[in-house]
């Protein structure tokens, strides 16, 4: 299924039904009083978070969503039927933004969470309502209210515990497939991953969700490559796992490229707990691995975990550390 994480839609509550002008007409009661009923309410627009959804594709090809109108009132003081509410299911993690994108109206972060964004219009009043001691036969009624309407943006930010970051071809998708049952596309060329992938890690009777986003390049926060579109998906992550390809020529520069992009995009990303690891260590000798660890660790003042997604070397230790950090946060 195509991954869509942004959509602009028009939503409108149902109109209220009109009130009715009616008078009793029964045998032997030639001058019956008013009996016009009120109109029914218009339907509401309701958003619901659904954990079984992971894309906004349902809003790509249909842009207008209208709740049902209320029915008009009827004689014998019958109130019109209310319009049905329109329920719009969206993935958990969906934000509803104003038309100018400057205001977050609501953030659906839980499965089953509901938000009534628009109320339907009230039903109009029938002529029974206007009967008084000085007006026994009112011919007055009111029309139903027009339902509110607005344009809104839907932004999906995936909910995960761990976000994987790194340059293109750093081994993120291979790592995800090694630790979860996720099956992302894997190939030996940059930008194999074009959409975020999610997987669940099970360890020591615990579990956590890992998100793999497309590789970042310098200038990602300005729209270079694919990064600026997908960086938002790791904003909600509790910790970041930064993968460095040990076969790359300039490891220090590669490290700072990613750190600079995270910092430039959001201060919240800059300050998140980061776990750093070397990938593809099965391609290097122990001497080379140790040399690169000694070269880089003192400079960045970080522990680096050497791993191989192919042989599973170092994976168990890394996952245990990730779980420990999650339990602290």
Swiss-Prot record:
Mg(2+) binds at residues 173, 193. Pfam families: GTP1_OBG (PF01018), MMR_HSR1 (PF01926). Keywords: Cytoplasm, GTP-binding, Hydrolase, Magnesium, Metal-binding, Nucleotide-binding. Gene3D superfamilies: GTP1/OBG domain (2.70.210.12), P-loop containing nucleotide triphosphate hydrolases (3.40.50.300). Belongs to the TRAFAC class OBG-HflX-like GTPase superfamily. OBG GTPase family. This is GTPase Obg. Residues 1-159 form the Obg domain. One of its GO terms (molecular function) is GTPase activity. Coiled coil: none annotated. An essential GTPase which binds GTP, GDP and possibly (p)ppGpp with moderate affinity, with high nucleotide exchange rates and a fairly low GTP hydrolysis rate. Plays a role in control of the cell cycle, stress response, ribosome biogenesis and in those bacteria that undergo differentiation, in morphogenesis control. Its cofactor is Mg(2+). GTP binds at residues 166-173, 191-195, 212-215, 279-282, 308-310. Signal peptide: none annotated. SUPFAM superfamilies: Obg GTP-binding protein N-terminal domain, P-loop containing nucleoside triphosphate hydrolases. PANTHER family: DEVELOPMENTALLY REGULATED GTP-BINDING PROTEIN-RELATED (PTHR11702), MITOCHONDRIAL RIBOSOME-ASSOCIATED GTPASE 2 (PTHR11702:SF31). GO terms for cellular component: cytoplasm. PROSITE patterns: G_OBG, OBG. Monomer. Its EC number is 3.6.5.-. It is found in: Cytoplasm. NCBIfam families: Obg_CgtA (TIGR02729), PRK12297.1 (NF008955), PRK12299.1 (NF008956). The keyword Magnesium applies. InterPro entries: G_OBG, GTP-bd, GTP-bd_Obg/CgtA, GTP1_OBG_dom, GTP1_OBG_dom_sf, OBG_GTPase, P-loop_NTPase.
């Amino acid at each position: 299924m195509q991954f869509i994480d942004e959509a602009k839609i028009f939503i409108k509550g149902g109109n209220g039904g009109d009130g009715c002008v009616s008078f009793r007409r029964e045998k032997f009661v030639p001058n019956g009083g008013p009996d016009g009923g009120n109109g029914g309410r218009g339907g509401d627009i309701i958003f619901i978070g659904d954990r079984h959804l992971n894309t906004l594709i349902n809003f790509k090809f249909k842009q207008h969503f209208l709740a049902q109108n209320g029915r008009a009132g009827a004689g014998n003081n019958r109130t019109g039927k209310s319009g049905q509410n329109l329920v719009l299911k969206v993935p958990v993690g969906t934000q509803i933004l104003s038309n100018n994108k400057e205001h977050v109206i609501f953030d659906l972060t839980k499965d089953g969470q509901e938000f009534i964004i628009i109320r339907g219009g009230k039903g109009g009043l029938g002529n029974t309502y206007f009967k008084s001691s000085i007006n026994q036969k009112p011919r007055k009624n009111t029309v139903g209210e027009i339902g509110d309407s607005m344009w809104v943006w839907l932004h999906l930010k995936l909910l995960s515990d761990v976000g994987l970051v790194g340059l293109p071809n750093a081994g993120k998708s291979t790592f995800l497939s090694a630790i979860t049952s996720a099956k992302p596309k894997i190939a030996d060329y940059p930008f194999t991953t074009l959409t975020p992938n999610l997987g669940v890690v099970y360890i020591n009777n615990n579990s956590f969700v890992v998100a793999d986003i497309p590789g970042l390049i310098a200038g990602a926060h300005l729209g270079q490559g694919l990064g600026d579109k997908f960086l938002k998906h790791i904003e909600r992550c509790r910790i970041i796992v930064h993968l460095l390809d040990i076969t790359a020529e300039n490891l220090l520069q590669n490290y700072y490229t990613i750190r600079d992009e995270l910092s430039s995009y959001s201060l919240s990303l800059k300050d998140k707990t980061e776990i750093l690891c070397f990938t593809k260590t099965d391609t290097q000798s122990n001497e080379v691995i140790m040399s690169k660890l000694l070269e880089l660790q003192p400079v960045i003042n970080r522990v680096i975990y050497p791993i191989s997604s192919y042989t599973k070397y170092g994976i168990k230790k890394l996952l245990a550390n990730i779980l420990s950090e999650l339990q602290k946060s």
